[in-house]
Amino acid sequence: SAQTAACRTETGIAYRDATGDGYVDSLCRLDICWPADRKGFPTVVWFHGGGLTGGRREIPKALCVKGFAVVGVDYRLAPRVKVADCVADAAAAAAWVVKNIASYGGDPRLIFIAGHSAGGYLTSMIGLDKRWMAPYGIDPDTAFAALIPYSGQVVTHFARRREMGIPDTQVVVDDMAPLNYIR
């Protein structure tokens, strides 16, 4: 369609430097779809759901044809890695967007972090707990226009509770719970 033709797409962009670890190098990638005929557009960084144990990056194309850039992010998955590694990957991807979106024509002041379910959890963690963006010199309070976590857990994620040998049904609020960082 004419609307879709106005979008450009680039896929498989590494947001972490190559490590030589095939798992890291294959999963720490993102796709970007952006308006080809505009500058200064807002950007949505989209983290997929899947319980932090499954899922693949995706781009909700409806946003791109409405004038947004959309960045679909893959991240490493539990139980192969710890939940903290999933969050660290989300932070690295968001930092890549902050540092690179202007080169695509996007407005770096209009970066929205969003995701569904596990992606909502990642959204909340990197946007509320400042330690995740700090290694990149980024303050989420000023770098992100908004956080949009759809159905994300605000207590400690069940995948983290599994790591700790705690039943999924037992609520835990520790340093990996977005609830601790709401301000």
Could you tell me what each predicted segment is?
Residues A92-R162, V173-D174:
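Primarily recognizes the serine-hydrolase "nucleophile elbow" in alpha/beta-hydrolase
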Residues F68, Y75-L77, G152:
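Active-site loop/turn elements of alpha/beta-hydrolase fold enzymes
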Residues R29, P42, V65, D85, ...:
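Extracytoplasmic/secreted proteins, especially bacterial periplasmic and envelope-associated proteins
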